[in-house]
Amino acid sequence: MAAKEILFDSKAREKLKRGVDKLANAVKVTLGPKGRNVVIEKSFGSPIITKDGVTVAKEIELEDKFENMGAQMVKEVASKTSDIAGDGTTTATILAQAIFTEGVKLVAAGRNPMAIKRGIDKAVASVVAELETLAKPTRDQKEIAQVGTISANSDATIGNIIAEAMNKVGKEGVITVEEAKGMETTLDVVEGMQFDRGYLSPYFITDPERMVCELDEPLILINEKKITAMKDLLPVLEQVAKMSRPLLIVAEDIEGEALATLVVNKLRGTLQVCAVKAPGFGDRRKAMLEDIATLTGGQCVSEDLGIKLENMTLADLGKAKRVIVDKENSTIVDGAGDGDKIKARVKQIRAQIEETTSSYDKEKLQERLAKIVGGVAVINVGAATETEMKEKKARVEDALNATRAAVEEGIVPGGGVALVRCVKSLTGIKAVDDDEQSGIEIVRRAIEEPLRQISGNAGFEGSIVVAKVRDGKDGFGFNAATGEYEDLIKAGVIDPKKVTRIALQNSSSVAGLLLTTEAAIAEKPEPKKDMPPMPGGGMGGMGGMY
C-alpha cells in the first residue's frame, strides 16, 4: 500500500479552496447572455468550444491531489444539478464557490464550522420557501419558448423549436435530440405509438413507391411467443378474413410455415395482413406488448395469463384507426383502448419511474410513457461544422431539460434576480448564536453572486447592478443582453424555479461538507527514479555492416 500524505485544519481547507477556485473560475465566465467561451483541447480531433458550464467542469483534472479533491467536489455539484434539473450548472458552481470562500474566512477567524453549516442550512431552507412563493406556472407556448431561449444562451430558434415540440407531443411526450445531415435545425413529430420494428417480409408492402405498408381500421393480434405452425393461427385468421378487415400481427417472431402462409394469402388478396416482430427484449418486451394491448383495447396472448393463440376470438384483438409499417418502424395511430385502462397504465409507469434508481431504466420507462400518452418529437440539430454541431447539440439538450423543469415547477424572474428577491426572507430567521448567524450572512452574500457574475461577464460593474436590483421589486432586474433595467418576466428573461432551487441546494450541501473538513488524505507521489545510463560502446561483431 502506497504511503499517504495528510493535511489538517486550515492547510487542508486552503488546498481544497484552491481547487474549487480553479474549477469555478473556469466555469463562471460562461454565465449569462454575454458569457464567454471556453476552449477545451481534445486528445484527437479539433478542440471543443463551449459555453456549457458542466462540459467545462467535466474536463477539469488538477495535478495536485488535494486541489483536485476540491475541484472534484464542485464538479459533482455541477453534474448532479445537470442530472436533476438539466441546467443551472454554472449557477450551482458559483454559489458553491461563494459559500465556501466566505465560510473558510470565518473558520480561519475562529468561528465554529458546524454552527456555520447549521446557519447555511437554515438560510437555504428559507430561500427555497421564498422561491416557492415567487414561482408562477408556465401559461403558454411563448413562455416555454422564452425559457428554452435563455437556457440555450439566447438562441431564439432553439427556444421556439422546443416550445413547438412540447406543444405537439404534450408535456409528457418524448423529445429526443439528434444530429441533422444539413445546416438547418428542424423538428420531426411522430404521432401515435411508434416502436423500432419493421415488416418481416417486403411482400407485406401496400405502397411500393414509399416502401411502406398502410392498414386502415386494422385488427391487431398481439402474441408474446414465436409463431411457426399455421394451425395455431388459422382459427383467428378465418374469423378476420370473414370480416374483410386488415390484420397486424405483433409477435416475438413469425417464421416458417406461418410466415409463408401469410405472404401467400396477402399476394392472392385473400387477406390484407402485415407481420412485425415485438419490440424490446425479455421483461421489457412483455411490458411493451402489454402497453400495445392497453392502447388498442386488445388482449396479449401470453402463457403467464394462460391465454392460447388457438383460442383467440375477434373480441380479443386490438383495434386502431391506422397502422403504418416501414422497413424499420411501426406506428399505431389512434388506438381504440379503454380510456380508464390507459390512465391506469400511465399511472403505473409513472410510479415505476419514481421508484427506479437506474438512469437507463428511467429513460426507457419515460419512452414507454410518452408512447402511450402522446407521441415522439425529434429535434434534428443542424450546423456548418462538427465542432459547432456538438456545441449546439449540448445547448439544445440543456434548453430542453430547463424547459421541462419550468413546466414541472413553474418560472421565476431570470438573470439572478429571483435569488436577490429571496434576501428579505433571511431577516426573520432566528439564529442560536453568532456563529450560526454568520452562516446565514454567508448565504445572504452568496445568493447575490450569480447576478454579480452575469453583469460582470456583460462588462458592467457587478456591485452597482446588485445594489440597483436590490432596491427594485418583483421581476425588476438587469437584462444583460440589452444592458437595460426592466421587468424581466415581461422581457422574457425567466428561469425555471426547479433549476434555481436545485442549484442552491446542491451547492450549499457540498460547500457545507468542504467547510466542515478537518483532514484531507491523498496518496504521496512517488519520487521519480532516474533513468539508468545507456550502456557504452556499440554492438559487438557488427563492424562490417552498413
Swiss-Prot record:
- Record localization: Cytoplasm
Which GO CC annotations does the UniProt entry carry? cytoplasm
Root EC class: isomerase
Any Pfam family: Cpn60_TCP1
- Give the catalytic activity: ATP + H2O + a folded polypeptide = ADP + phosphate + an unfolded polypeptide
Family in the record: Belongs to the chaperonin (HSP60) family.
Top-level division of the source organism's lineage: Bacteria
Q: What is its EC number?
A: 5.6.1.7
Q: Subunit details for this protein?
A: Forms a cylinder of 14 subunits composed of two heptameric rings stacked back-to-back. Interacts with the co-chaperonin GroES.
Gene3D superfamilies, per database record: GroEL, GroEL-like equatorial domain, TCP-1-like chaperonin intermediate domain
Q: Which UniProt keywords apply?
A: ATP-binding, Chaperone, Cytoplasm, Isomerase, Nucleotide-binding
Show the segment(s) annotated as Disordered: 525-546
Q: Where does ATP bind?
A: 30-33, 51, 87-91, 415, 479-481, 495
Instruction: Tell me the lineage of the source organism.
Output: Bacteria, Pseudomonadati, Thermodesulfobacteriota, Desulfovibrionia, Desulfovibrionales
* Biological role: Together with its co-chaperonin GroES, plays an essential role in assisting protein folding. The GroEL-GroES system forms a nano-cage that allows encapsulation of the non-native substrate proteins and provides a physical environment optimized to promote and accelerate protein folding.
Q: Where is the composition biased (Gly residues)?
A: 536-546
Spell out the molecular function terms from Gene Ontology: ATP binding; ATP-dependent protein folding chaperone; isomerase activity; unfolded protein binding
* GO BP, sorted A to Z: protein refolding
Protein name, please?
Answer: Chaperonin GroEL
Q: Which InterPro entries match?
A: Chaperonin_Cpn60_CS, Cpn60/GroEL, Cpn60/GroEL/TCP-1, GroEL-like_apical_dom_sf, GROEL-like_equatorial_sf, TCP-1-like_intermed_sf
Q: Which gene encodes it?
A: groEL
